[in-house]
Protein backbone atom coordinates (compact mmCIF):
# COMPACT_ATOMS: atom_id res chain seq x y z
CA UNK A 1 0.00 0.00 0.00
CA UNK A 2 1.28 3.47 -0.86
CA UNK A 3 2.55 5.75 1.87
CA UNK A 4 1.55 9.38 2.32
CA UNK A 5 3.13 12.10 4.45
CA UNK A 6 1.35 15.01 6.10
CA UNK A 7 3.03 17.93 7.87
CA UNK A 8 0.43 19.31 10.27
CA UNK A 9 0.19 22.45 12.41
CA UNK A 10 -2.51 22.65 15.10
CA UNK A 11 -3.48 25.99 16.67
CA UNK A 12 -5.61 26.90 19.68
CA UNK A 13 -5.35 25.71 23.26
CA UNK A 14 -3.21 22.74 22.33
CA UNK A 15 -0.26 22.95 24.72
CA UNK A 16 -0.47 21.83 28.34
CA UNK A 17 -3.41 19.52 27.53
CA UNK A 18 -1.50 16.30 26.67
CA UNK A 19 -1.99 16.84 22.93
CA UNK A 20 1.43 15.39 22.10
CA UNK A 21 0.98 12.28 24.26
CA UNK A 22 -2.48 11.53 22.85
CA UNK A 23 -1.19 12.10 19.31
CA UNK A 24 1.71 9.71 19.90
CA UNK A 25 -0.58 7.03 21.32
CA UNK A 26 -3.10 7.30 18.47
CA UNK A 27 -0.34 7.30 15.84
CA UNK A 28 1.26 4.18 17.30
CA UNK A 29 -2.12 2.41 17.44
CA UNK A 30 -2.62 3.27 13.75
CA UNK A 31 0.96 2.21 12.89
CA UNK A 32 1.73 5.71 11.62
CA UNK A 33 5.32 6.87 11.88
CA UNK A 34 6.68 10.36 12.51
CA UNK A 35 6.84 12.83 15.36
CA UNK A 36 5.04 15.61 17.25
CA UNK A 37 6.35 18.66 19.11
CA UNK A 38 5.31 21.93 20.72
CA UNK A 39 6.30 25.15 18.97
CA UNK A 40 7.31 28.35 20.77
CA UNK A 41 4.34 30.20 19.20
CA UNK A 42 1.84 27.94 21.02
CA UNK A 43 1.06 25.59 18.13
CA UNK A 44 1.69 21.86 17.91
CA UNK A 45 3.55 20.53 14.86
CA UNK A 46 3.41 16.92 13.69
CA UNK A 47 4.56 14.78 10.79
CA UNK A 48 2.47 11.69 9.98
CA UNK A 49 3.70 9.07 7.55
CA UNK A 50 1.71 5.93 6.82
CA UNK A 51 -1.17 4.64 4.76
CA UNK A 52 -3.63 7.26 3.50
CA UNK A 53 -6.57 5.98 5.61
CA UNK A 54 -4.47 5.93 8.80
CA UNK A 55 -2.98 9.39 8.21
CA UNK A 56 -6.37 10.89 7.32
CA UNK A 57 -7.89 9.41 10.47
CA UNK A 58 -5.15 11.05 12.58
CA UNK A 59 -5.66 14.38 10.84
CA UNK A 60 -9.40 14.17 11.50
CA UNK A 61 -8.69 13.50 15.17
CA UNK A 62 -6.46 16.61 15.31
CA UNK A 63 -9.53 18.79 14.68
CA UNK A 64 -10.80 17.90 18.16
CA UNK A 65 -7.76 16.52 19.99
CA UNK A 66 -7.97 15.44 23.63
CA UNK A 67 -10.98 16.61 25.62
CA UNK A 68 -9.01 19.41 27.34
CA UNK A 69 -7.90 20.95 24.03
CA UNK A 70 -9.66 23.73 22.14
CA UNK A 71 -8.52 23.41 18.54
CA UNK A 72 -9.00 26.54 16.45
CA UNK A 73 -7.18 25.58 13.27
CA UNK A 74 -5.51 22.60 11.60
CA UNK A 75 -3.16 23.31 8.71
CA UNK A 76 -2.12 20.33 6.58
CA UNK A 77 0.72 20.28 4.04
CA UNK A 78 1.03 17.11 1.96
CA UNK A 79 4.63 16.12 1.23
CA UNK A 80 6.41 13.27 -0.51
CA UNK A 81 6.88 10.37 1.92
CA UNK A 82 10.49 9.68 2.84
CA UNK A 83 10.15 6.19 4.30
CA UNK A 84 12.73 7.25 6.88
CA UNK A 85 10.48 7.97 9.86
CA UNK A 86 10.73 5.59 12.80
CA UNK A 87 8.29 4.76 15.56
CA UNK A 88 6.14 7.79 16.35
CA UNK A 89 7.82 9.94 19.00
CA UNK A 90 7.45 13.17 20.91
CA UNK A 91 10.26 15.58 20.02
CA UNK A 92 11.41 17.74 22.93
UniProtKB/Swiss-Prot annotation:
Entries under InterPro entries matching the protein: Acylphosphatase, Acylphosphatase-like_dom, Acylphosphatase-like_dom_sf, Acylphosphatase_CS
Keywords noted in UniProt: Hydrolase
SUPFAM superfamilies xrefs: Acylphosphatase/BLUF domain-like
The keyword NADP belongs to this UniProt entry's keyword annotation: no
Domain of life assignment: Bacteria
Residues covered by the Acylphosphatase-like domain: 5-92
Pfam families reported for this sequence: Acylphosphatase
Coiled coil location: none
Molecular function GO terms recorded: acylphosphatase activity
Gene3D superfamilies xref list: 3.30.70.100
PROSITE patterns given in the database record: ACYLPHOSPHATASE_1, ACYLPHOSPHATASE_2, ACYLPHOSPHATASE_3
Stated name of the protein: Acylphosphatase
Species of origin: Chloroflexus aurantiacus (strain ATCC 29366 / DSM 635 / J-10-fl)
Amino acid sequence: MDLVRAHVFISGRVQGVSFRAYTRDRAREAQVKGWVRNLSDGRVEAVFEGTRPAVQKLISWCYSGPSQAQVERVEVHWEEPTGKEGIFTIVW
